[in-house]
Amino acid sequence: MMNNKVYKRSDEPVFWGLFGAGGMWGAIFAPAVILIVGILLPLGMFPDALTFERALSFSQSIIGRIFWLLMIILPLWCGLHRLHHMMHDLKIHVPASSWVFYGLAAILSVVALIGIFTL
């Protein structure tokens, strides 16, 4: 007997990939940036390492822009993916929840992209 069902292709692997990348990025790079910018620099360590001019030139370079985009966009996708599945787990049914959460992540990613590249 043959099974002639046509299965709908899922878009979930794309979102799981962004979720995983955002979680990994947030676990590895975000604590390092918080440690350096939020703790070590205010304590006066490395006073010449992050002057305004150096920070601005890094942020305006292509590597710096990509770094800041990844710092913003990947954890954003991770967080909104978690919220989407948390609502499902708590049985709070948001109408068109995939469109709401992933659409919001896409819109905020575009806003971040515009903001970073107009810096």
Swiss-Prot record:
Q: Which Gene3D superfamilies match?
A: Fumarate reductase/succinate dehydrogenase, transmembrane subunit
User: Topologically, how does it sit relative to the membrane?
Assistant: Multi-pass membrane protein
Keyword Transmembrane helix belongs to the record: yes
Give an example GO biological process.
Answer: fumarate metabolic process
Q: What does the UniProt keyword field contain?
A: Cell inner membrane, Cell membrane, Membrane, Transmembrane, Transmembrane helix
One GO MF term, please? succinate dehydrogenase activity
Pfam families hit by this protein: Fumarate_red_D (PF02313)
The family annotation for this protein states: Belongs to the FrdD family.
The task this protein performs is described as: Two distinct, membrane-bound, FAD-containing enzymes are responsible for the catalysis of fumarate and succinate interconversion; fumarate reductase is used in anaerobic growth, and succinate dehydrogenase is used in aerobic growth. Anchors the catalytic components of the fumarate reductase complex to the cell inner membrane, binds quinones.
Q: Protein name, please?
A: Fumarate reductase subunit D
Source species of the chain: Edwardsiella ictaluri (strain 93-146)
The coding gene here is frdD
